[in-house]
Design a protein with these regions (language model features):
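C-terminal catalytic and target-recognition region of SAM-dependent MTase-like enzymes
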Residues: 90-149
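Short, well-ordered secondary-structure micro-motifs
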Residues: 41-44, 64-66, 105-106
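S-adenosyl-L-methionine
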Residues: 9-52
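Active-site proximal loops enriched in glycine and acidic residues that flank catalytic Cys/His/Asp
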Residues: 15, 33-35, 54-57, 64, ...
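Mobile active-site "lid"/loop adjacent to the S-adenosyl-L-methionine
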Residues: 11, 33, 50-81
Length: 149
């Protein structure tokens, strides 16, 4: 079995509904609404570890005290911090970004640098929406994944 922790306010309500609809009402899921960096720092202090991380950070945001989050400035420190949460033998680390200025190569470099000690492989690609009228793809962001060998 596995356990899951979801900490995004907008996703918690939606995910709870999906868990109930999927027969997972009593599954070991931690529902949290919290600042991500503060959550990660607390988990590190508690000695908790995770086998996988799925991250979908916002492009821009403001905290309750006016703190500003800009993905271009904050993503590297956040990923570096999150690597301290990983178990000794992690399965994967996934980052989705719907910021068109954050290219797949940046996510690949970031994951390759911060996950190097785990000896896995890195993949990154553009996220896009197909345009039916012309067969082209409208770029919407990037996805990067590190996975164990």
């Amino acid at each position: 079995g596995s356990e899951m922790c979801i900490r995004d306010r907008g996703m918690v309500t939606w995910a709870k509904e999906n868990a109930v609809a999927s027969g997972l009402k009593d599954a070991p899921i931690r529902w949290l609404v919290d600042d991500c960096v503060k959550f990660v720092e607390r988990e590190i202090r508690r000695g908790n570890h995770y086998d996988a991380i799925i991250m979908d950070p916002p492009s821009y945001g403001r905290g309750p005290k006016g703190e500003i989050w800009k993905i271009e400035e904050a993503i590297h420190p956040l990923v570096k911090l999150c690597t301290q949460l990983l178990s000794d033998d992690p399965l994967f680390f996934l980052i989705n970004s719907y910021t068109t200025g954050l290219q797949p190569a940046v996510l690949a470099y970031l994951l390759g640098t911060e996950m190097k000690r785990f000896h896995g492989k890195v993949m990154a690609e553009e996220i896009g929406l197909p345009v039916s009228s012309n067969g082209l793809v409208l770029p919407c962001g990037a996805s990067g994944r590190w996975e164990s060998l």
